[in-house]
Amino acid sequence: MGVVSISMPDELEERIDTFADEHGYTGRSEVVREAVRNLMGEFEDKRLEDRELMAVVTVLFDYETTTVEEKMMHLRHDHESIVASNFHSHVGDRYCMELFVLEGQLEDISAFVGKVRATKDTLSVDYSVLPVDDINMFT
């Protein structure tokens, strides 16, 4: 098995150690391997291919980190074909939340979410995806 070195904030490293201890993992590597498998599995879910989807993406970042807000603006414009709606809100005294409603194919939504997740200085990125063809408005 190969060895991979990664950088992360001390706080995240401590959280991984605590998580490993509390959940019976043998160490950080096992936690990171499982997290990577799960993340990759999210983007490789074949059940959602070739279907019309809607997604909600929520991004949390520090108010002082203007580069994140600027990056979100560029992503919104670069992906305007799938961004149905976008909402910006202040959370508490220090944070901003950016919410995107997307409509499109899995490949396009995955590309958007990947770019959001890759944005430096985001504190949290969450999303959910729902096939539009599963929605029965008359039930």
Swiss-Prot record:
Domain of life of the organism encoding this protein: Archaea
Binding site for Ni(2+): 77, 88, 90, 96
UniProt cofactor note: Binds 1 nickel ion per subunit.
Cofactor: Ni(2+)
Keyword terms: DNA-binding, Metal-binding, Nickel, Transcription, Transcription regulation
A GO MF term: DNA binding
Pfam families: NikR_C (PF08753), RHH_1 (PF01402)
GO BP: any one term: response to nickel cation
Function: Transcriptional regulator.
HAMAP family: NikR (MF_00476)
Family per similarity comment: Belongs to the transcriptional regulatory CopG/NikR family.
Name used for this protein in its record: Putative nickel-responsive regulator
Organism: Haloarcula marismortui (strain ATCC 43049 / DSM 3752 / JCM 8966 / VKM B-1809)
Source taxonomy: Archaea, Methanobacteriati, Methanobacteriota, Stenosarchaea group, Halobacteria
